[in-house]
Every structure is written in C-alpha cells, then in structure tokens.
A protein has these predicted regions:
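A conserved beta-strand-loop-helix scaffold within acyl/acetyltransferase catalytic domains
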Residues: 2-53, 57-70, 114-119, 130-266
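Aromatic (often tryptophan-rich) hydrophobic motifs at membrane interfaces
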Residues: 92-103, 218-335
C-alpha cells in the first residue's frame, strides 16, 4: 500500500535526497528547479509517495500553469516521474493521486516526458494502456525538452574517453590548447553578464531565441547555491570568446547553454570547453555527460547538422527519448488546447520576429 503527500519547504532536502538516488532522477525534478519555474508563470507542487514504513518510493515535481482565455490549468512534470517507472502498481497509484489533484485544481491534462529511451516499449505500452496520448512527435526542438540527445558514458578513464573522440575532435581540442585558449572555471555571478553578451552575439548569428538576462540571474540564484549549476568561460589573448553553462545533479552532468563570439572562432574554444566540462563531471563522480539536444533530422543539408556533427565528435550515444505523453482529464478543453496552442505559439513567434526585424533596422540606421 502507498500513501501520497504534497510537501512544503521544510521537507526540501527530504525530497531532493530521494530524487538524487532514485531511478530516473533528473535535475528538472529537483525542488530548486521548481522554485526557478515558480518565479515565472508556473506554480510548483512536490508530491512524494511513501510505503507503509513511511519510506519514499516515488516522487513528482509538478508544475501548474493557467491557460489564457480558457482559465484552466495544465500540469507538466519535466522529466518525471522519478522512481521505478516499470512498477505498474506504484505508477497507477501515482497517476491516480495526480487525477485527484487535477480535480481539485481544475486541470485539463498532465504532460510528462520521462527520461526513458524510445526503445522502452514496455513503458510506452503501459502509458497507452492507462490513457496517455502521445504528443509532440517532432524531429527538431519543438518539444518542451529535447527528444534527441547525445550521452557520453563517463565510466572509462579520461585517457580512454579522449582516445575515443573522433580524430577531428581531438585535433581541434589540442589546437585550442596550442593557441593558448584558457578556461576559467571559478566563475562567479559577476561573470554572468560576460557570458550573456556572448550568448546574444551567438543568437544573432545563428538566428535562434534566448531567454532574458533576468531569467539567467534567477537560474543562478536558484541553482548555484545548491551546487547544480556552473559557468565556464573561454579566454583568448585575455578576452572572453566563448562560454557554457552546465547542470550537475546526482550522477549526471548536462551541457545546457553554449555561446561563442564571432571573433577567434578558429581557435576552437568550444572543444576545449567541452573537454573541461567532461573532466569536471568526472571529478564529481558523474557516470553520464549529457550533451543535450540535437535534431532528429540527420540529413547533412539540415541547418542543424553542424550541431549534430560537433556533439557526435565526442563519441556519445545518440539517444531518442520516448517523447511527450499527455494524460487527459478534460477531453473537451484538451481539444480546445491542442487546436489553439499552435496558433498562440505561431503568433508569439511572429511577434518576436517582428521585434527582431525592427531591432535590426535600428542598428542599420
């Protein structure tokens, strides 16, 4: 028999300690990540399932957000649940408790995107049998979390890891070292504006969107004190030319954001940054280094193929996740949401592109 509870702040460490050691743990299921999202439009709820001995057996950090116009809530559990996902009795109880919360809060559906490979047919069949609807079957970055990533097994020693890199990757890494690129690892919050300036330069060059600087400040304040976030900066001839942000939780490190200036890209700072982060992950007893998202379209004429080739060079395993699944509580409102949400996102993108175009015109003036 299982029991569920919604936790308050006093039990933050209890929650995190379970998530850290549990199967399918993930930084996006930590208390601090919920706090970060809670600074925006989301409201976090932390649910724990306990057995008769009052020991935790499963957990779920659930984010709730109110939909404009409809006035209803949606639930999202990023990379959740945490626990034995193949224990059907446990999962059945967990989702039944989420249903109760949904009735209380007037939620339309729960979205999950568990840290599970698409090859896990048993879990996919279980979710379908319990009424989950597959959603977000895309090849790019359209989902809430990347569907395709590279993951590097860190259990070999560093010499073996380096030897397994593609020859061109090793060459570029050593080129950066020969050219005198230096990596600053002991970065403080005062270095964050430096990184963000380079990130803005990257977004303008590569034409993708980025969050506001305020969001990065909030991310720093929520995650750095817990030891979950680290900034790396690459310097060449005394000037910052590239940077990365990485997460670390449990036995996994994630490469989250990368940025490079237009100048001096030929000294290959990004390769040395990745190698530095891999060594940092090893020093912190990580077993996995996650390079995060790549496109699922592996055609060489795909504009995102260069990102795939860069990450592939470190000899990680190309991984496709099972994807997003929705557990629908209100079919009528869910139907409205699935039809209106793409239109909403399309108009948001148009507005952003318009603002960028205006910004570009002002610069040319």
């Amino acid at each position: 028999m299982f029991y569920s509870r919604l936790l308050e702040i006093a039990e933050k460490e209890y929650f995190n300690n379970f998530v850290r050691q549990a199967p399918k743990n993930h930084i996006l299921q930590t208390w601090e990540w919920g706090d970060l999202k809670g600074k925006g439009a989301w409201v976090p709820y932390r649910m724990v399932l306990e057995n008769e001995e009052k020991q935790p057996v499963a957990a779920l950090s659930l984010l709730a957000r109110r939909i404009p116009v409809l006035g209803k809530l949606i639930f999202y559990a990023p990379r959740g649940p945490v626990g034995d996902l193949h224990n059907q009795e446990l999962m059945d109880f967990l989702f039944s408790e989420v249903r109760k919360l949904a009735r209380e809060k007037d939620a339309i559906f729960l979205k999950i995107d568990p840290d599970v490979s698409i090859e896990d047919l048993a879990l996919r069949e279980y979710l379908r049998s319990r009424g989950f609807v597959a959603a977000g079957r895309k090849e790019g970055f359209e989902g809430l979390q990347p569907k395709f990533v590279f993951r590097l097994d860190l259990t070999p020693d560093l010499d073996t890891l380096l030897a397994n890199f593609h020859a061109k990757t090793r060459y570029n890494l050593r080129l950066a070292e020969r050219k005198g690129v230096e990596i600053k690892e002991n970065c403080g919050k005062e270095d964050l504006p430096i990184f963000y300036e380079i990130l803005q330069e990257t977004t303008e060059r590569d034409k993708f969107l980025v969050r506001s600087y305020h969001y990065f400040e909030e991310m720093w304040d929520c995650l750095v004190p817990a030891g979950y976030l680290k900034l790396f900066l690459a310097y060449y001839q005394g000037k910052p030319i590239a940077g990365t942000l990485a997460y670390l939780f449990g036995d996994t490190a994630w490469y989250i954001y990368g940025a490079s200036a237009n100048a001096h890209r030929n000294v290959m700072p990004n390769y040395l940054l990745q190698w530095t982060m891999i060594k940092w992950a090893k020093e912190n007893n990580c077993k996995t280094y996650d390079f995060r998202g790549v496109s699922g379209n592996l055609a060489e004429d795909n504009p995102l193929y260069g990102l795939y080739r860069f990450k592939k060079g470190f000899n990680g395993t190309f991984t496709e996740f099972s994807g997003e699944y929705d557990l629908v509580f209100s079919p009528f409102y869910y139907g409205l949401w699935t039809n209106l949400e793409p239109l909403y996102q399309k108009n948001i993108r148009r507005l952003i592109n318009f603002k960028k175009a205006i910004k570009g015109e002002k610069r040319r003036d």
